[in-house]
Design a protein with these regions (language model features):
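Membrane-interface helix-boundary motifs at transmembrane edges
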Residues: 85-93, 170-174
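Final/C-terminal transmembrane alpha-helix of multipass membrane proteins
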Residues: 16-20
Length: 223
């Protein structure tokens, strides 16, 4: 009982610390709720300086769609669990819970995009039912570090960190480790379009570049 109480206190302390860090910054961002809308609402125009260069992006049509991405992750995880003997120990309901938890963490995914935006940025949040996706779009200019945070924070939080947690728990807390592994795998697939948007920018834009999104296209320029 004492161990459970200690764990709950630690978890509560971590959540409180996270709230103290995240809440003040998210309040400094101007959030505009677009509601349930169409894919075109994600295309917000911005005033670009002359000479701004469009980033050449190559997005995989397979991973670019959330439904297909989740299907691919399901197949991959199924193969891994089939080959892994320890997979027999995890209850089927726990697997389903992990998948659903990842799917319903999409709003958190978009809020983390908004949190990573520079203070004072206007961020549009919405849901596109036809694609089964949400979005958090800003046309605020960002330096390369800010843009990297904007694109990568969700993948770290709901993909990489759960996988690290699974590795740490695998010996003594097998069920929790399996849950975090499945959640993290789906989290990485869910954030795959972010990586496809970030990597071309890092390859094409110089270190002192300013990055700005306009009408769904990413541009970079120097001042």
């Amino acid at each position: 009982m004492k161990k459970k109480t200690k764990k709950l206190l630690i978890a509560g302390g971590v959540l409180l610390l996270a709230a103290c860090i995240c809440v003040p910054h998210i309040c400094s961002v101007q959030i505009r709720w677009d509601g349930i809308t169409r894919i075109q609402s994600m295309n917000i125009p911005a005033k670009l300086p002359k000479g701004a260069a469009a980033v050449k992006e190559k997005i995989s049509p397979l991973l670019g769609g959330t439904v297909m991405g989740f299907a691919l992750a399901g197949i991959l995880i199924g193969v891994i669990l089939f080959l892994k003997k320890t997979a027999r120990a995890i209850h089927r309901k726990l697997r389903i819970l992990a998948v659903l938890s990842s799917f319903f963490s999409m709003p958190l995914h978009e809020l983390m995009h908004a949190w990573a935006c520079p203070a004072g940025s206007e961020v549009h949040l919405g849901i596109v039912p036809e694609k089964l996706v949400g979005y958090a779009v800003t046309n605020a200019p960002m330096n390369l570090a800010q843009f990297t945070a904007y694109m990568a924070v969700p993948a770290v939080a709901i993909g990489i960190l759960p996988l690290i947690g699974a590795l740490c728990l695998r010996k003594h807390h097998r069920n929790q480790a399996q849950f975090m592994f499945i959640y993290g795998m789906f989290g990485l697939v869910q954030t795959a379009p972010d990586w496809f948007g970030l990597i071309p920018v890092l390859r094409q834009a110089p270190a002192d570049a300013v990055v700005q999104i306009s009408n769904g296209i990413t541009y970079w320029f120097t001042r």
